[in-house]
Amino acid sequence: MMSPMASILMYTHFRMWKHALNVWSITLFQNFRLTAELIILFTLLNFLFLIPVMNVFAFFIHNVVNFSLIIYFSKLYLKVKGNEEEYKREIERTKLAQALKTYLPHAVTLTFATYAMTVAYLILLFVSLLILGLITGITVFTFGTDFIIAYLIFIVLLLILYFWIITSYPVFFARTVIEGQTPRDFFFLFLTAPFSKLLWKLAFSLEVLFSSFVIGFFSLFIFLFQFVMSHLFPPLFFLTYFVAFSNTLLIYLFGVISVSYLLWKREGK
């Protein structure tokens, strides 16, 4: 098994973003049977969304399945200390049922934790709007000429909230997966992740910042590919949920890789 210091040297040689893309592609395509089973699984989940009364339930199930798989692959990555060759061998032995059920309880509690965090963010957004309203006299309930300004403020805050979620959740997830053992751990570690000193160090790592930019660009490309595929090539619509999962997997795997990089670097010293 690769030592922490060897892992650091590997990051230096490959660049973190390249290593993240390698791990991501190994996860999705190294085991052909697993790839086929994942496509079938997300195609079946897609049908749940076609039933109106099942939409809320389908959304919850989709989140739990996503987290079950991503937690499993992340734990596998941590087990081999970032060694790509060992990770390949582990993926080749992986079965879908094993990946789904191993951390299913953890995925359920983590899903509820993300919901709780999102509600907290929405409350923060609402409070921010109230404060802005008191300062400027312009609220989302403003009518007349100030309505456009109020609407723009609301949109800007929503965009800030959205980008905060998609950039912070993978890092919160990483801290949770690295330190958590029980389903209860996963719930509380995720909710307290914003106060973790280790995660704040990511903001001062140039390697992490540069790699996150590259991964973000690649993730945007996947999203655009999914959009084009679903709208211009209807016969391939059944693949869209698998593509969406692959995008989520990339973002969260990178979160795990970047946080573990800092930990292994500290251990190497």
Swiss-Prot record:
Location in the cell: Cell membrane
The organism's place on the tree of life at top rank: Bacteria
Membrane topology per record: Multi-pass membrane protein
GO cellular component terms listed in the entry, alphabetical order: plasma membrane
Principal place of residence: membrane
TM regions (residue ranges): 21-43, 48-70, 121-143, 147-166, 205-227, 242-264
Keywords assigned by UniProt, alphabetized: Cell membrane, Membrane, Transmembrane, Transmembrane helix
Protein name: Uncharacterized protein aq_1793
Taxonomic lineage of the native organism: Bacteria, Pseudomonadati, Aquificota, Aquificia, Aquificales
